[in-house]
Amino acid sequence: MDVGAKEEEMGQVWWGHRAWSLLSAVRARAPLVQCITNLVSMDIAANVLLAAGASPAMVHSLREVPDFTPRCDAVYVNVGTLSEDWLPSMRAAASAGRPWVLDPVAAAASGFRMKACLELLSLCPAVVRGNASEILALASRSTAASSNFKGVDSSHCSVDAIEAAKALALSSSAVVAVSGAVDFVTDGKQVISVSNGVPMMQKITATGCAVTALIAAFVAMEPSDAIVAAACALAIFGLVGEIGMESAKGPASLRMHLIDALYCLNEETVTSRVRISLRP
């Protein structure tokens, strides 16, 4: 979708109503999201999906994929705790014909991980979401892409990865989202910026994994417009972080309050506080 014309006409008003419309659709339809995700993130990803109104399913057995995955509305694949046992399930689920989202956690950590990410990327995800270092490494097709690699945390700012994200989007035909202080979402041509969120969210493990799961739920509602779905999911998640921070004393209480905030979000808050714009 060319969001430029819509934004020029209505700006933040359009984005606010679009974000609310997608969240409302998730609440009304309760999309079933299969999550083949890392062990660290299962709890927060499931709770974020539930708070948004989706139905999470942490189903990763290869023997279940043929029966279960076709019933799902979307699939979320995360390589954070990648193992040879899980990779066939990831391949099978990604090939099942459902819209799916890839989180290439720590893509540059090992040759095995990079090879797996590139193989999954070839299976046509609707969205790829990672931090700047992950997107830079994936775009370069090299484990040596970042000499300052810092595990699952990014050693680059999100703006550093915009051009890499655009190139990756064009080569893979996926929407690519780069998380950071400002999030960027691109289809290779348009770049959308999302400015919601608070720094302390980075102190909670697996928040990136959780927002990728939320993106999958939004993509399930709008599979033909993944760039808008991804941008709105990122904005909603950042917004509930802002709301949660108003009551939080630290990372643990922020985790609790942001999940509550997601469950309680109303139209007025969403339409007035999401900060999404088309990057010139």
Swiss-Prot record:
The gene is THIM. Thiazole kinase involved in thiamine salvage pathway. One of its GO terms (molecular function) is ATP binding. CDD domains: THZ_kinase. It catalyses: 5-(2-hydroxyethyl)-4-methylthiazole + ATP = 4-methyl-5-(2-phosphooxyethyl)-thiazole + ADP + H(+). It comes from the Eukaryota. Pfam families: HK (PF02110). Substrate binds at M58, A206. Its cofactor is Mg(2+). Belongs to the Thz kinase family. This is Hydroxyethylthiazole kinase. Gene3D superfamilies: 3.40.1190.20. One of its GO terms (biological process) is thiamine salvage. Keywords: ATP-binding, Kinase, Magnesium, Metal-binding, Nucleotide-binding, Plasmid, Thiamine biosynthesis, Transferase. HAMAP family: Thz_kinase.
